[in-house]
């Protein structure tokens, strides 16, 4: 399906590698997410009609609210390239939220993060969950997976080898063998 059809279905995603517009400001990056659902014509934008001005003001207000909700409002005028890595990840998720999605697909959001950034990300994802978002997480950092997931599906070479609650998956012999090389004692802490 076309990307706009997926977004209209309420689904948005982030990628393992950060895909921000690094030479644009934080606010502008979030605004990009709002433009998938534009309600004005090309001519409205070209001539900056009252309709265009009203809708753009609403989108800007919404983008600022999203930045407030994730703690990046104070960075709205900074360039994305100047944000620390963890904040760039948050910004990418904020842009996904700006599309209006309720299902967020996060591909390796903790990749490249230190422990402090990973913990901050976990808290952020919990906040999203509490706000009614559904998060589908693809992640190899087992501490992140075990600390954030309600339910886990484990895939090994394209085949599902386990599913269940974190405590059950952590002790599943097939999971231990596939992801931890057969070291079963205290496999996931």
Predicted regions located by residue number:
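Glycine-rich phosphate-binding loops of nucleotide-dependent enzymes
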Residues: 1-189
């Amino acid at each position: 399906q076309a990307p706009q059809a997926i977004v209209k279905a309420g689904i948005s995603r982030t990628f393992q590698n950060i895909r921000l517009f690094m030479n644009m400001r934080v606010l502008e990056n979030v605004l990009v997410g709002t433009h998938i659902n534009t309600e004005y014509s090309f001519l409205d934008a070209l001539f900056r009609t009252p309709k265009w001005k009203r809708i753009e003001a609403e989108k800007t207000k919404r983008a600022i609210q999203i930045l407030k909700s994730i703690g990046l409002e104070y960075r709205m005028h900074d360039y994305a390239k100047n944000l620390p890595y963890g904040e760039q990840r948050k910004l990418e998720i904020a842009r996904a939220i700006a599309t209006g999605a309720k299902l967020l697909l996060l591909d390796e959001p903790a990749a490249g993060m230190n422990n402090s950034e990973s913990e901050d990300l976990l808290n952020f994802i919990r906040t999203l969950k509490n706000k009614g978002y559904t998060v589908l997480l693809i992640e190899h950092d087992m501490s992140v997976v075990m600390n954030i997931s309600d339910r886990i599906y484990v895939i090994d070479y394209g085949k599902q080898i386990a599913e269940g609650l974190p405590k059950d998956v952590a002790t599943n012999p097939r999971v231990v063998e596939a992801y931890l090389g057969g070291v079963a004692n205290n496999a996931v802490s």
